[in-house]
Amino acid sequence: RKGISDTAIIVSTGPSLTKQLPLLKKYASKATIFCADSSYPILAKHNIKPDYVLSLERIPLTSEFFNNDFGEFDKDIVFVLKSYVHPHTTKYLQKNNRNFMLVSTYASFINYLKLDDFGYFNMGFSVANMNFLLAIHLKHKNIVLIGQDLAYAKDGLSHTKDYSNLDKHEGHFQRDKNKYTTQAYGDNGKVESSFVWTLFRHNFEQDVANAKKNYYITTYNCTEGGARIEG
């Protein structure tokens, strides 16, 4: 699968995703689509088929993004899972015969198991970081980010309105307000972020710089909202 297209589009679940979906649907056939586990049911709802769906969380709540049956929509999608995702994730994928693979990151215990033949790759802190690094490994020349807000919307929403766990983030905007303020996308003022999103953003900035310097990959943040990602 290396080099099958020049451009990778990474779909995350920030508040700005909703407005990007019509354009993504229009150009889906012209790029390779990588999506986060939380974006997968949203893309299915809008009949936008990803090439890869990635997941790395160990909690059962994340597994529920796969507790569904989209029938023919899932054909030819590759689900890439970090090797210690919650067991419910693989159970749900196996139930509907979806194609998945387990991958490991570099860690002392993993190395001790001597699973070298299966390979390793660094995955970062979030599933979006994991998507970005896989896109590098698959030798895409351009990486496009959408839905990668890493900040609250002006109305306080943490994720796009189609996100199934919005209720789990109620009160977070009030909790974080004025604590993690950062530069907005396009230098359009300031936005409110969170401690975790700030970590993810810094991780992204390192990855973007590394991709540009060492692999000559150009990254385009097309989120049109959220926090500015330097690089």
Residue ranges of model-derived segments:
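Metal-ion/cofactor- or nucleotide/acyl-coenzyme-handling active-site neighborhoods
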Residues: 1-34, 41-231
